[in-house]
Amino acid sequence: MKLIAYNKQLFTVALLLMMLCSFNSYAQITYVVSVGLGEYKYPDIAPPLPCSLGDARAVSHFFHNYNGSKVFMLLNENATRKHILKVLRTEFSKSTVNDEIIFVFSGHGIQGGLTCYETKDMSSIITYNEIQDIMKSSKARRKIILAMACYSGGLTLKSNNYNKKNTEKSSVMLYTSSRPGEVSWERSDMNNSFFISRILQAFHGAADKNSDRKITARELFNYVNPRVIGDTGGRQHPQLWGKFDDSMVVVYVK
């Protein structure tokens, strides 16, 4: 009887440990800052974009329904340089090592940076270095930037196509909608840009080829890239850049 009771205790302890490990793999907070700029203060410099607000709202909606997420959406006049940087610094600084931080931007891009609501010259953009510094200061292991913007591939001079050798942990994954010098395409009759549309499909499970309910960086790239290239007739080539493990989980599928 003592042996049976002892074995039951061991089984109970083992079961609790398994449950704890399983819980820890999902027990995280995903901090999301989603910026959409469909209209700018100076439309002669930055003309309206039909899909940017829809992009930001759609991504925000996805993560609002995502377990353990905190979502912050900034649209049009609320997406000033000062406000974007403040929200990024404030919210991402709250993250811990087991959390994930995601910055999503849909709007006009420029070589080396992203435009803000009041952008009229280079002094009023947000540079990639500024974003990267904020991301790197976070304790989170998983750090992701999704940039839907023309010339977004020029956010970094080292922007290359996918490089599976980049496996340094706790770095920033930058996924841009186009190569340097390329336009990122959208249509006025669409709610979302081609890039964000394909990303959302991937997030909902279309990219989960091995059916493990996880979308990794590799799976995201493999799903999104050929489809965006096809959608745009070969005129747009998304770029995945950074030092990270290609098996890094971007999202879990419900």
Question: Which ranges hold each PLM region?
Answer:
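Bacterial N-terminal signal peptides that target proteins for export
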Residues: K2-V13
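Bacterial N-terminal signal peptides
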Residues: T12-S22
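Cysteine endopeptidase catalytic domains of the caspase/legumain-like
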Residues: F23-K254
